[in-house]
Amino acid sequence: MVGIDLGTTHTVVAYADLKTLAASPLPPGEGSEARAAPSPAIHLFPIEQLIAPGAVAARPLLPSVRYHLAEGELAPGDVQLPWSFADPGEVANAVLGELARERGARVPGRLVASAKSWLSHAGVDRTAPILPWGAAEEISKVSPIAASASYLACIKAAWNRRFPRQPLERQEVVLTVPASFDEAARTLTVEAARLAGLPQLRLLEEPQAACYDWLHRHHGEITTALGESRLLLVCDVGGGTTDLTLIQIEPGESEPRLTRIGVGEHLMLGGDNMDLTLARTVESRLGGNRLNAGELSQLLQQCRSAKERLLAEDAPERAPVTVLGGGARLIGGARSAELGRDDVLSLLVDGFLPQVGPGEIPQSRRAAVVEFGLPYAADPAISRHLAAFLAQHAEVSRRALGERALPGCPPMPDAVLLNGGVFHGAA
């Protein structure tokens, strides 16, 4: 069995030998008991990719980005892969993964990012070549569905090179999607997999996948770990979306019984929004004219890298961010600014995770904030969206909690599972 987390920012692959799989817990939502069955060994699959011109190496994560090279930008040997790769987007000069991310942070207007968010955007033709968004006419374009397919095709090629006798298209493949993806977005995800040469797969909602992971890590001690908890909140904040799920916990014959009782609406709010906030802050410090779409995309990649450095252990106090010009202005048109660690903590914690009361609701505006054509949530405060979600599901939550619900108080989950890269920073 092969599990693929096709993320907005990164893609990761894990696998287990089904021959050692005696049994496994059924997904929450099917009224299943989290049975303590013998667990197979789970392995991460290091994904070979270009990490620099002419250099291929295996990495635990594949950045979910692609870069469309200009003619003559790199020599053919610099982008040669150790396998045959046919781009589903039919762009002859595309590179994927770490090298794509590195080039996109240096050259504006050629990076395709957040394809997963575009798959869920009903306001555009997701089969049309529209990415990179706002790029110049002479730059090759790709559709959101083809971009997503290209990451899966890259994984398939790397897998088949390592396991030629167990090709990926013949394995049991599970692909994760946000719980809030509608039927159209799920259908497009399946179509992207088909374009990548993976016609047979199952979709698994990301909060359920997080529960699977938790159950696996607490194998044999699930009852003890959950204690007397009766209501589990899964808060999954990824690169492009925030998924909120409520799961009722009931005593079972041998292990607790987990049933999904609430799913939040599709919320385009995650790490991308945080990077955009940082980019807009840096843009205001650069001086000069407002950045165009290509320059802002370049700045986003630099801010994402700076954010990760500034929130890591032993982080520096400040990190430089530079926006290069295009064409003949590549060096002469460069503009630089700095981001401080305190800047990042203040903008992200106070802006996206402020302390709020249980009665607060998201601030409504006329429409969602549109950047790069994507309809981001108008209110960036995840905690306010969480408060509204819990208020919406107050009745079922109170029933799930039973006598553990406090009289006269809003019902609150007594167990929380946090998932997503946002919660992994050392800060």
PLM feature spans:
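Extended, hydrophobic alpha-helical segments in both membrane/secreted and soluble proteins
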Residues: 185, 189, 193, 207-210, ...
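Conserved phosphate-binding/catalytic loops in two-lobed NTP-binding clefts
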Residues: 196-209, 375
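Conserved phosphate-binding catalytic cores of ATP/NTP-utilizing and phosphoryl-transfer enzymes
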Residues: 203-235, 394, 401-404
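Short beta-alpha connecting loops at secondary-structure transitions
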Residues: 258-269, 286-291, 370
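Glycine-rich phosphate-binding loops at beta-strand->alpha-helix junctions
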Residues: 173-188, 324-330, 336, 374-381, ...
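Phosphate-binding loop and its immediate beta->loop->alpha context
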Residues: 27-194, 205, 276-319, 330-368
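Gly/Thr-rich phosphate-binding beta-strand-loop-beta motif of the actin/hexokinase/Hsp70
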Residues: 1-22, 219-260
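Flexible phosphate/Mg2+-sensing switch loops adjacent to catalytic phosphate-binding sites
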Residues: 19-28, 36-61, 217, 224-228, ...
